[in-house]
């Protein structure tokens, strides 16, 4: 896929032309760096999020989140989600199995949106789906883009 930012006057159909062509080099340099920052920050966010679940314990997570929202078997799902958020968060940070874990986390966010947050409305302050939708879409974008040049996936030369 060509990620070159066009700076010439003849722009192909469907492409945009930079208002200030002098920025093309900056954008081309920053694209992989910015994508890496996004991947790492999302991984850190999942680690921070799962820390609360570990402090509560799987039984409390199962009772307060899964069983309360009709997701059964609640204890099994508590363990699965805690594993996914912990291991997936670390893998996003280092860029290992990036596409797999980003897709799995995007699916988790979709399920959380539909079963837990949607009935509460949009606003995150009221437990709504605002935050979950955003993180889910960012995970989807990471799954499509992959780990990028600054990832273990790239270092080993293989990814899903």
Segments the model singles out, each with a brief description of its role:
Residues 54-76:
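Membrane-interface interhelical connector segments
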Residues 1-53, 75-83, 87, 93-160:
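Extended, low-polarity transmembrane helix blocks
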């Amino acid at each position: 896929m060509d990620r070159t930012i066009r700076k010439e006057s003849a722009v192909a159909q469907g492409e945009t032309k930079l208002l200030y062509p002098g920025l093309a080099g900056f954008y081309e340099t920053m694209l992989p760096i910015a994508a890496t920052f996004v991947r790492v920050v999302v991984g850190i966010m999942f680690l921070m999020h799962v820390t609360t679940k570990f402090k509560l314990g799987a039984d409390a997570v199962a009772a307060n989140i899964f069983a309360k929202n009709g997701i059964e078997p609640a204890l099994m799902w508590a363990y699965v989600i805690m594993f996914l958020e912990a291991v997936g968060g670390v893998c996003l940070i280092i860029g290992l199995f990036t596409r797999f874990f980003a897709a799995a986390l995007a699916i988790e966010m979709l399920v959380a949106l539909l079963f837990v947050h949607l009935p509460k409305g949009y606003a995150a302050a009221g437990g709504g789906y605002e935050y979950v939708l955003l993180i889910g879409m960012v995970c989807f974008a990471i799954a499509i883009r992959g780990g990028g040049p600054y990832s273990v996936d790239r270092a080993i030369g293989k990814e899903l």
